Amino acid sequence: MGAVKLYKYLDFNGGLMMLHYSNLQFTNATQLNDPFDCHPSLIDFSNVPKEACGGWTPEIIEELRRDPFRRTREEVWICSLSKIYDSILMWSYYSKHKGICIGLDMEKVRKYLSRMQGGIMIGCAEVEVQYKDIVEKPDYFRDAKDFFHYQLSTKAKAWEHEQEVRLFILDPWPTYMSLLPGQNDDKGPIDWKEVRAFPEIVGECFE
């Protein structure tokens, strides 16, 4: 069972849009503020044992093992929430302390994100972020870990004040995708990873 109540920090306009449209914004993992977030480099793939090579070079095996994690980062959209509503640092990130912090009843959010909408199951997973010294990387070939969970849930200790819990969706359905104000294709095609996902919830989820 996850947290009962979580909080979303936004700038003023983002908060108004979230309440008006009753949705949550999910951002592709490659577009998050921390360049190391969900990055395959959180895991050490370099110590390839000889028996894993099977006639291939260690470099090829290293790339083959890393590639699924690279694809995961490109295919997952994340909604970052917090367990706290009174962090000065968090407030400072949004409009110079003039943003909005919206409470979410997570029991209701989970209910509405685990339903059919237009014949499509929205569905999302939830994970509490763990903060670690990311210089010390787990060894892919020698450590027994759920490395995909590690990739999606691990951040540097410098971010520990965020007390983040994240929701994530893999390859969100195009119906939920929308451009942000100011995003357009005047300068050429927009990278799909720059487009946000906005699955709907309902007003009763907000507190």
Stretch-by-stretch model annotation:
Residues 1-207:
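Partner-binding and oligomerization surfaces adjacent to conserved cores of proteins
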